[in-house]
Each structure stands twice: as C-alpha cells, then as structure tokens.
C-alpha cells in the first residue's frame, strides 16, 4: 500500500497543558471536526474517546497519552494527548521526544499554572515549536490578554496573538482573525456554522493594535519583509502566513489563538493553525544517533529511502493483544511481519501486526512510513526508549532520561493466590512506566513500590486490582530518602578466610569522594601493574553498588559519589569474584562512614492558591512545615504563594489546607530537588530505622 499522505502533509503534534485547562475536550473536538468521532464525548460525563482507561473516566483526568490519527484539509495529523497532572510528567517527557510540534492549551481564567511551566520547560528542552490556545473563553473571569502576558512573563516566551476574542464569559461569540482582518461569529451550538463578517466597531482599535504587533513580529523573521514593513508597504496574507510559520518553526514566536472547546468555538481555526504553522517531519533536523558497532555519531535523514529507524516511546499492556509498543518512525519504512533489530538491547525482534490507533479502537495496517506514529504487537523485549532499526544499518537514537521516584509504599498481597499474580502485575506495570519501580525491603522482605507521587501510586494499585485482579493491602506512603557523602576518604576492604578447604581472599583499597547532585555513581579503576587481576575489577564495582543500595547511616541508597580503586592484592589460589565483591562492599562501608555521610530528602516546589483572608494562616503553616516562601502574587481575588517544602512535611496537606481555608484553597506540588536533612531530624530518621 503506497503512502497516503506525503511527508510534508504529516503533522505529529502533542496537546499539552495544566490539569483541567481543557486539553482532552479540545482533542475530542478536533476528532469530531475531522470526522473521526460522530458524537462528541464529554470529559465530565466520563465518555471522552481519548480517556479510555476506567480510572481516567472516573477521575476525569488523562493518565496515559493515547495516540490517535485524524485528517484535516488534506493533511494527516497524529495527535498525542498528554496528561497534565504532575505525577505523570514522564508521559509528557516521552511524548515530547517523538513529536514535531505542540499545542499548549491554557485556561483563560487560571492562565499559566505550575504544571504549564513544567511542561513548557520540557518542550524547551527538546526545542519543540508550539502554538498556544487560550481555552475556556466562556468561563467567568476569562481574560485573553492576561493569559498572553502571563505566557510572556512566566514562561519567558514570545507570544503573538493571531486572533483576539469577540466578547468574553457568556458573551463570547467568536474571534477576530488578525491575518485576514475578518470576524468569525459562531451561529450554532456545534460550532460547525460560522459567519465571516467585518470586525465589530468596538473592537476595531484593539484589532488594529494587535495586527500591528503581529506584522512587526512577522517582519523580524525575514530581512525582505522587514524592509517592506519599514517602508510602510502592505504585507500580503501569504507573506504573513509564511513569516508566522518561519518564526514558529525557529521557536522565536508562539502564535496565540483563543476559543471555547466545550462550546465548540475556535477549534477549526486551531486545526488550520496546526496545519499552517507547525512543522512537518521534513522541517525538523535529521535525527542523530550512535552506531553501536563503531560508537560514532550517525545520522538518519527524514526519508522513506533511508534505512529503517524508530523509537519506542510507550509500552502498554492491552487486554486483547498483549503488549503494545507505540513507536515513531524517523526514517525508512516497515511492513508487518518483518524482523527488526533492537539496537538498545542487541536483540532481533519480529513485528507481528502494526496498528494505527484511534483513541480506543484500532485499525490494522500493512506498512508504516517515515514520520508515522503507530503501535506494534509482538515485541517481547522492547521497553520504553529503545531504538528499533534495520539490522544491516544499526543505530541507537538518543534515549530519554527519567526522574527518580520520590515516594514509596509497602504493598502485600491479601492471599497466597494473589502473591504470584501481584509479582507479574507489578512487573508488567513497571515495563510500561519507567518512573514506577518495585523492589524488596532487605530487612522486612516486603515488596516496596515507588513512584512520582501519591496519585501515581494510587492509580498503579487501582490498575493492579482492575486489570490483573490482584487484591492487596497498601501501607502508608513513605518518603524515598537518599544518603550521600560530603567529604573525601580512603578506605580498604580485606576479606580473608583460610580455615580448611578452599580459602577466600580479596583486598581492595579505594578513595571515595562526593559528586554534584544528580551525578549518580562513578567507578574509576586506577589499578596498575596487575596488583588486582583485571577479571576481579567488575566484582569490586558490583560489591560497591550493592553496598550503596543500603547506606551506612539509615540504610537508604547512597547517591552522587565517585569511587576510585587505587590499590589491593590477591592470592593465586584463594582469590575469587565473590571474595573481591565482599572486599568492595567492606571498603565502601568503611569509606562512606568516614566521608561525613548525610541523609537527603526530596524537596517539593509547592504553589498554594487561597483567598486573601487565609493568606497569613497558610504562610505560617508552610513555615511550620520547614518550608521556604519564594514569592507571592495576586490573581484576581485570590493570592498565590510559591515556595519549597520537604515532601515528608506534605503528607495529608490536602485535608489540612481544606480545613484551614474552608475548602477554598488549592495547591499543586512537584518534585524539585534533594536537600540535606537537618541534623535533629536526621537523628530521628536514623533512630526510627534502627528501631
């Protein structure tokens, strides 16, 4: 089957936003207008097509980013709906990795909220061109222009409106298109019919002012246009559109549109903007990777003729077909039933069927081409972030980095029958989600699950019960503390057993030193002259890694340190890998204890929104939780307090805030960084762990 849409008529976009800005509703409307869905699904009825997990329909939030495909004005648009809740930022990170452009949805009342900042920074990191859509223009308190200035101030972006609203709140009737300088007035409720008329008189001045700002921004994209603009010549509609596209692709400007997705206003112009201003796969640089054989950089041009390469960006357990791997094709083409090479794992895999996903139903296709996003059935060893490619032309595309979990709970199966099922369920769920980890507590033997927040773990447990029918008891959430060292030290580990039979002998001398936060663990081998045979070096490294899992102070994992192996000795007969592993472990324990060890705790960035009269109370409470206030600002009649608070002090904060503010306060928090725990609190943690 030949390619349906040429590459320049393909758009891979994400829809990203803060929770509740109306992202899923916007996607639903897009699917409705592009003819993919015959009846509009409403999020608050639990019937939205994109939110297809039961948990999502109950909670009215989007958890997994469903990929779906639709068509508009002769273009294929692949949409990835990303979750806006902070516990699921890993999904957003994954999606941005495989997108070419994005639509950032903002609420016209809330403006730029904390999660919008996080998502925006993630998009900046990957250099994703964006257009902004200020939604919910029909809500009380809607203010388009405040939204635009917040994008400028809080996100440091360059927002340029290409539309302005006609009316606001319940008077929101349509939009003024600043490119054509015409008004679009919506006539019916479904928003399918609209009248194009002259701009209402009361808006003529403001439309002219914003048109001028648009022309100025467009002129900056091109010298010729700049000359024309400065000489006072009119720019043609085509020149304006080309200028907007050029600046958007270079991430120099963010075109801003407005509408009310729920009331079906403004969605078709948004689709037009996606097609006109966001990049096709050919507009972005060729993808870079590393040749696993030579270790040298390799490039794949965006073309069906190039060797096949693709990145698996999401794995999902599907009740009907088993494991589904979502992937983005960067070069070449792929037929179902063919073999591919997983260069990340070094294994060959067979692609069973290839499915094109529409939010919750699927269509089987024979072939996928460069720029497509699809899902494959039958990949056994592939996990998130793996590269699949042509075996004759191997390449590893850059993978993704995921944050460490900050919270964990103990979980126990209710019955013996649940025990085996639970292990399988947790294994499957951790394959899908790299920020969810499972481990066993060495002392108690309990299974520990870790994740990005309370909601994240609640949903995991919920899915385990629904999808895998596992009943489990869940403990109280615990903070994922870490340990690190603050100074250098030298230490040795000597393990000698020479009593009857075969002896054991391992001896290692190490230097241990702190690294900057987030650097992880580094092992440097400086053994010279064969004082320790080469084959025993990895055993010492493994011994240190294992010992670092349970730190010297309170048994928490030790992070951010470098060990240099400087000396040691061995015995011709008695030395073994086991002996050197134990020697490495002993050396680490002695070294870490000498190197001024400390406990680290996760610190959260917190933003609390409260009516003014509760402000003093809320600030006092944050201070009493060892918090640091960073700043305050007023939004309408409410005040926003921003600060940093240790996660251990935030358990149960939701209930507390509700009772302090009579249910009128709201807060969001996200992981920021790790900080050293004050000594008096560290002593309490150590005493509790040692029981």
Swiss-Prot record:
It is found in: Cytoplasm. Residues 8-282 form the tr-type G domain. Keywords: Cytoplasm, Elongation factor, GTP-binding, Nucleotide-binding, Protein biosynthesis. GO terms for biological process: ribosome disassembly. One of its GO terms (cellular component) is cytoplasm. InterPro entries: EFG_II, EFG_III, EFG_III/V, EFG_IV, EFG_V, EFG_V-like, EFTu-like_2, G_TR_CS. GO terms for molecular function: GTP binding; GTPase activity; translation elongation factor activity. GTP binds at residues 17-24, 81-85, 135-138. It comes from the Bacteria. The keyword Transport does not apply. Its main location: cytoplasm. HAMAP family: EF_G_EF_2_B. NCBIfam families: EF-G (TIGR00484), PRK12740.1-3 (NF009379), PRK12740.1-5 (NF009381), small_GTP (TIGR00231). Belongs to the TRAFAC class translation factor GTPase superfamily. Classic translation factor GTPase family. EF-G/EF-2 subfamily. Catalyzes the GTP-dependent ribosomal translocation step during translation elongation. During this step, the ribosome changes from the pre-translocational (PRE) to the post-translocational (POST) state as the newly formed A-site-bound peptidyl-tRNA and P-site-bound deacylated tRNA move to the P and E sites, respectively. Catalyzes the coordinated movement of the two tRNA molecules, the mRNA and conformational changes in the ribosome. This is Elongation factor G. It comes from Heliobacterium modesticaldum (strain ATCC 51547 / Ice1). The gene is fusA.
């Amino acid at each position: 089957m030949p390619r349906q849409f040429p590459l320049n008529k393909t758009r891979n976009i994400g829809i990203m936003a803060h929770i509740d800005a109306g992202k899923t509703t916007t996607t639903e409307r897009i699917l409705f207008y592009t003819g993919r869905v015959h009846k509009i699904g409403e999020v608050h009825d639990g019937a939205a097509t994109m939110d297809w997990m039961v948990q999502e329909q109950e909670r009215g939030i989007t958890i997994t980013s469903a990929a779906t495909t639709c068509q508009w004005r002769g273009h294929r648009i692949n949409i990835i709906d990303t979750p806006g809740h902070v516990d699921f930022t890993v999904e957003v990170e994954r999606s941005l990795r495989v997108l070419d452009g994005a639509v950032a949805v903002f609420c016209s009342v809330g403006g730029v909220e904390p999660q919008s900042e996080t998502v925006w920074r993630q998009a900046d990191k990957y250099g994703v061109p964006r257009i902004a859509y200020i939604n919910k223009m029909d809500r009380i308190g809607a203010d388009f222009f405040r939204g635009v200035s917040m994008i400028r101030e809080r996100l440091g972006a360059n927002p340029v409106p290409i539309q302005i609203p006609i009316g606001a709140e319940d008077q929101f009737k349509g939009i003024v298109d600043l490119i054509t300088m015409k008004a679009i007035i919506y006539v019916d409720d479904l928003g399918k019919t609209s009248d194009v008329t002259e701009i209402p008189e009361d808006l003529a001045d403001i439309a002219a002012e914003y048109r001028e700002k648009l022309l100025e921004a467009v002129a900056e994209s091109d010298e010729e246009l700049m000359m024309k603009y400065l000489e006072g010549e009119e720019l043609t509609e085509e020149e304006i559109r080309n200028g907007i596209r050029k600046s958007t692709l270079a991430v120099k400007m963010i075109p801003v549109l407005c509408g009310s997705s729920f009331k079906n206003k403004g969605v078709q112009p948004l689709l037009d903007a996606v097609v006109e201003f966001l990049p096709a796969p050919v507009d972005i640089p060729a993808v870079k990777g590393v040749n696993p054989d030579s270790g040298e950089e390799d490039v794949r041009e965006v073309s069906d003729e190039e060797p096949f390469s693709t990145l698996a960006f999401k794995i999902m357990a599907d009740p009907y077909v088993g494991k589904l791997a979502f992937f983005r094709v960067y070069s070449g083409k792929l037929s179902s039933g063919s073999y591919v090479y997983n260069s990340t794992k070094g294994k060959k895999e067979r692609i069973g069927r290839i499915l094109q996903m529409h939010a919750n139903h699927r269509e089987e296709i024979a072939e996928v081409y460069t720029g497509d996003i699809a899902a494959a059935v039958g990949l056994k060893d592939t996990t998130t972030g793996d590269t699949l490619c042509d075996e004759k032309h191997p390449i590893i595309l850059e993978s993704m980095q995921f944050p460490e979990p900050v919270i964990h709970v103990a979980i126990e199966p209710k019955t013996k029958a649940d025990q085996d099922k639970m292990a399988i369920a947790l294994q499957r769920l951790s394959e899908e989600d790299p920020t969810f980890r499972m481990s066993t507590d060495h002392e108690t033997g309990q299974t520990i699950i870790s994740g990005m927040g309370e909601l994240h773990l609640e949903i995991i447990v919920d899915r385990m019960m629904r999808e895998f029918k596992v009943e489990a008891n869940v403990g109280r959430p615990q903070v994922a503390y870490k340990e690190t060292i603050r100074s250098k030290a030298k230490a040795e580990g000597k393990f000698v057993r020479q009593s009857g039979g075969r002896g054991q002998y391992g001896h290692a001398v190490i230097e241990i030193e702190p690294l900057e936060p987030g650097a992880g663990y580094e092992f440097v081998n400086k053994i010279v002259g064969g004082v320790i045979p080469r084959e025993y070096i990895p055993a010492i490294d493994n011994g240190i890694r294992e010992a670092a899992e349970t730190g010297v102070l309170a048994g928490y994992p030790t992070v951010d340190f470098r060990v240099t192996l400087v000396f040691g000795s061995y015995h011709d007969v008695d030395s073994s890998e086991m002996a050197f592993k134990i020697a490495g472990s002993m050396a680490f324990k002695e070294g870490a204890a000498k190197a001024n060890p400390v406990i680290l705790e996760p610190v959260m960035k917190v933003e609390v929104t409260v009516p003014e009269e509760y402000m003093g109370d809320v600030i006092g409470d944050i201070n009493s939780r060892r918090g640091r206030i960073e700043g305050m600002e007023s939004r309408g009649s409410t005040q926003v307090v921003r600060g940093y608070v240790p996660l251990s002090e935030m358990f149960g904060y939701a209930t507390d805030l509700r009772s302090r503010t009579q249910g009128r306060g709201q807060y969001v928090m996200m992981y920021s960084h790790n900080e050293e725990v004050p000594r008096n609190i560290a002593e309490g943690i150590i005493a509790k762990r040692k029981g």
